[in-house]
Every structure is written in structure tokens, then in C-alpha cells.
């Protein structure tokens, strides 16, 4: 392979990598705007916004993380939950980000309402488990949130 062939491939790799990173940033912006501009009371608070992941505090007790999976050219978005004190961060869902700006092949990352709805579908099990625990006056176990199980009454 000549230096020019390698140069051409390197340019292609860099361009595609930049494009994927741009799509990730657009998704993050749409999700943050969707949450902050929503009239619904989701009890989400923005906690941190580093380059790699988003973090929201839920009910002042749980953290929800949204991040691109590790690895070069990863198209997998991962959703995690942990307690606010940092107990055992666990994945609750995944989605796929395409190079053309779609999530799971159906959600346009530029549409903040669609992005928010998709995100809420991914974390709905957390809300369901918390609701059931509160309704039945029982404590919440993080592993139950991850599995989407209702705490025992």
C-alpha cells in the first residue's frame, strides 16, 4: 500500500469519526433540550456534561448516565443508573446511533421531542420500579431498578 492510499484511508476514517462524534453531540443537545424544555415534571436535574457522557439526577437520589460505549467507532449508546453516592453503576438499556443521525433506525436525533420520548422509553423501568416501591411503602434496591422489577411488598 502506498503512502497516498494510506493517506486516503486515514482521511476517510477521520471524516467518519468526526461525523459520528458530531451526531453524538447533536443527540446530547437534543436530549438535554428535550428534558429542560419539557413541561412534564420528570424530576430530572442536569448533573454533569463532560464530552463523553450526560448525567441526570433523578429524584435527588439516583443518577442516570447516557454515554457512547467504549471503543473506537462505537455506535452504541448506553444508559446506566446508580445511586447518588456512586453505588454500583449498572446498564439499564442500549440504543444504536447511526452515522445518518438516527437512533435505533427510527428516531431523528434533531427532533428533541422524539429523542426525549425514546430516552424515557429506555428508562421507563426505573420509574415503574420507583412508583411501585413508593406505592407499597417499601425500600428500593438498585438491582430491582436495573431489572425493572417491582420491589416486594
From Swiss-Prot:
Coiled coil: none annotated. Disruption phenotype: Increased expression of the hyf operon. The keyword Endoplasmic reticulum does not apply. InterPro entries: Tscrpt_reg_HycA (IPR021285). The keyword Transcription regulation applies. Keywords: Transcription, Transcription regulation. NCBIfam families: PRK10198.1. Regulatory protein for the formate hydrogenlyase system. Could act by directly interacting with FhlA or by preventing the binding of FhlA to the upstream activatory sequence. Also down-regulates expression of the hyf operon. This is Formate hydrogenlyase regulatory protein HycA. It comes from Escherichia coli (strain K12).
Amino acid at each position: 500500500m502506498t503512502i497516498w492510499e494510506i493517506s486516503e484511508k486515514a482521511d476517510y476514517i477521520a471524516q467518519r469519526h468526526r461525523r459520528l462524534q458530531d451526531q453524538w453531540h447533536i443527540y446530547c443537545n437534543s436530549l438535554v433540550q428535550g428534558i429542560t424544555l419539557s413541561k412534564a415534571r420528570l424530576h430530572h436535574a442536569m448533573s454533569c456534561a463532560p464530552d463523553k457522557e450526560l448525567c441526570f439526577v433523578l429524584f435527588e437520589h439516583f443518577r442516570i448516565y447516557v454515554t457512547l460505549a467504549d471503543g473506537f467507532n462505537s455506535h452504541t449508546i448506553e444508559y446506566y443508573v446508580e445511586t447518588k453516592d456512586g453505588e454500583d453503576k449498572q446498564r439499564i438499556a442500549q440504543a444504536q446511533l447511526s452515522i445518518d443521525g438516527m437512533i435505533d433506525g427510527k428516531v431523528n436525533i434533531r427532533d428533541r421531542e422524539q429523542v426525549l420520548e425514546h430516552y424515557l422509553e429506555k428508562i421507563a423501568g426505573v420509574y415503574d420500579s420507583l412508583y411501585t416501591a413508593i406505592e407499597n411503602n417499601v425500600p428500593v434496591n438498585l438491582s430491582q431498578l436495573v431489572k425493572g422489577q417491582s420491589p416486594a411488598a
